[in-house]
Amino acid sequence: MKYLYLHGLGQNADSWNKVTRATEVSGNSACLDLAEMVKGKVATYSALYSAFSEMCNAENEDIILCGLSLGSVLALNYAIDYPKKVKALVLIAAQYKMPARLLKLQNALFHFMPQSMFQQTGFGKLDFISLCSTMAELDFSD
């Protein structure tokens, strides 16, 4: 069984280091770098989810997904699409229906923030704006 840790939009894969060191499964776990999955592409939710799904589908064993914020949305989406592949979910700050107005406000604020505020995450400023814009219509409530 493989444990996959997914960070949020404002973090990076290193955000899970303390967690993986504290667990007994660190040898069979991976902290995924979401920015790397869409590197060289327009950072849309569908591009990110597609890359994430391909990576999960390539695993030869069941997976346990642990996601924070954006990572939890990806994990939830994958578990809905591939329920037999996902053994368990740990979702932190998950949204099953995106708060569209809040995402629009957040994007408006992103426009005024300097590029340097985004760099340590691996995503650029335009990536943040694009991801949030393309997530606004997500709704897993059905």
Ranges and model annotations:
Residues 2-8:
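Short beta-strand element of the alpha/beta-hydrolase
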Residues 8-11, 69:
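Active-site glycine-rich loops that stabilize anionic/oxyanionic intermediates
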Residues 10-18:
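Serine-hydrolase catalytic-loop signature spanning alpha/beta hydrolases and amidase-signature enzymes
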Residues 17-21, 30-64:
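Active-site loop/oxyanion-hole signature of alpha/beta-hydrolase fold enzymes
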Residues 65-67, 92:
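Short beta-strand immediately N-terminal to the catalytic nucleophile in serine-hydrolase-like folds
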Residues 67-71, 75:
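Gly/Ala-rich beta-loop-alpha elbow adjacent to hydrolase catalytic centers
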Residues 80, 88-116:
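Flexible "cap/lid" loop of the alpha/beta hydrolase fold
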Residues 133-142:
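Conserved serine/cysteine hydrolase catalytic core
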